[in-house]
């Protein structure tokens, strides 16, 4: 039954900007960095998880939520003999799927760009395939908790304010706490802090010189489990 709700929610966004955004955001990120071949992969990932992805995720959630909110204010959905709770969960599910798709499109573009630079400029990959996959999975899972929050923000304060609060203030907060002892208690810093260990990239875009501070596998796993639990709650 829940799958039927998700399928119905997905159909609402057929031929809309919401689905275009899944391709546009990763493509723009890759294109912006392709002409700096030496740092293409590192810069692309840094721009993605620090700037473009938070905006993409927040805007996607807001567009998913506003599809029923808008002018009708959920009146069309409320008049149907369906569970409103399941409709909301379907919105969370669809936004999560779009987030995954966008991230793995970015992963593909990052690796394709890396191999193209290897062939054209003979510059080796700075992020390997396994490392890129692990980094992308961490980005997806560690940011899942933002989806219900962004949907709620969009419903309460609208798209513009939701983007300002989550993609703007939230991202800035995450950047400043990611390299401090407060990173664990600030969910916005989870993704940038994980990238220090998984991809070897600091929030300012510089490669990590000292890997001693890198987290262990179990610490990385703990952060991902906490994010999943918080998302499920």
Regions found by a protein language model. Give the residues of each.
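Aromatic- and glycine-rich beta-strand/loop motifs that create alpha-glucan
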Residues: 1-23
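Helix-capping/transition residues at the boundaries of transmembrane alpha-helices
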Residues: 12, 77-79, 154
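Residue-level recognition of transmembrane alpha-helices
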Residues: 23-26, 91-92, 166-167
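Secretory targeting signals
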Residues: 26-57, 93-159, 209-218
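Terminal transmembrane helical anchor/hairpin motif
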Residues: 39-40, 163, 167-233
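Helix-loop-helix units of permease transmembrane domains in multi-pass membrane transporters
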Residues: 64-97
């Amino acid at each position: 039954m829940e799958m039927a709700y998700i399928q119905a929610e997905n159909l609402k966004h057929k031929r809309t900007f919401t689905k275009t955004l899944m391709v546009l955001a990763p493509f723009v990120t890759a294109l912006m960095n392709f002409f700096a071949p030496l740092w293409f992969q590192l810069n692309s990932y840094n721009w993605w998880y620090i700037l473009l992805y938070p905006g993409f995720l927040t805007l996607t959630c807001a567009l998913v939520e506003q599809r029923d909110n808008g002018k009708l204010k959920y009146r069309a959905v409320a008049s149907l003999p369906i569970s409103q709770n399941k409709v909301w969960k379907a919105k969370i599910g669809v936004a999560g799927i779009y987030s995954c798709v966008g991230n793995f499109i970015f992963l593909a573009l990052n690796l394709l760009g890396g191999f193209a630079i290897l062939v054209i400029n003979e510059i080796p990959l700075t992020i390997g395939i396994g490392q890129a996959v692990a980094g992308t999975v961490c980005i997806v899972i560690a940011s899942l908790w933002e989806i219900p929050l962004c949907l709620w923000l969009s419903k309460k304060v609208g798209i513009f304010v939701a983007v300002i609060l989550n993609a703007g203030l939230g991202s800035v907060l995450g950047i400043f706490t990611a390299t401090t002892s407060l990173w664990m208690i600030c969910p916005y810093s989870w993704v940038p802090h994980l990238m220090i260990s998984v991809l070897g990239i600091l929030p300012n875009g510089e490669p990590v010189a000292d890997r001693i501070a890198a987290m262990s596998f179990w610490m990385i796993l703990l952060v991902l489990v906490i994010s999943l639990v918080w998302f499920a709650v």
